[in-house]
């Protein structure tokens, strides 16, 4: 009888733990929306840092990770493209959730003439 109780408790604990999602980054976020480009390279971002090709801006008041946060941006291209950029600016972006440099936008697999692409980012 004691073995059955212990086994039942073990199964209950195991199934309860299985219901939780453990992550190495408790603050991980996933944001869906359009990715656009802007020519901020060489200008001073909201972080005070001079912006480079792999810096980006997030939408002000929508999602504001800390300055310097590593962001993985995914375009819904075929094949799927992924770039790594760093949040060092913010912007109003009426039709997007992430602004990247022209070089980073091209790395997603699109010409600048496209303007915006569907995708998401995570950090």
Curated annotation (Swiss-Prot):
Top-level taxon in the UniProt lineage: Bacteria
InterPro entries noted in UniProt: RlpA-like_DPBB
Alphabetized Pfam families for the sequence: DPBB_1 (PF03330)
Induction of synthesis: Positively regulated by the two-component system YycFG. Expression is maximal during exponential growth.
Protein name: Uncharacterized protein YdjM
């Amino acid at each position: 009888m004691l073995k059955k109780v212990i086994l039942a408790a073990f199964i209950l604990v195991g199934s309860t733990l299985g219901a939780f999602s453990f992550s190495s980054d408790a603050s991980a976020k996933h944001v869906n929306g359009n990715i656009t480009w802007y020519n901020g390279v060489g200008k001073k971002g909201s972080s005070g840092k001079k912006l480079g090709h792999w810096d980006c801006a997030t939408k002000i008041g929508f999602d504001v990770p800390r300055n310097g946060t590593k962001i993985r941006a995914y375009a819904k291209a075929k094949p799927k493209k992924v770039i790594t950029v760093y949040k060092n600016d913010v912007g109003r972006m009426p039709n997007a959730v992430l602004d990247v440099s022209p070089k980073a936008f091209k790395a997603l697999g699109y010409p600048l003439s496209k303007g915006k692409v569907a995708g998401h980012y995570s950090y």
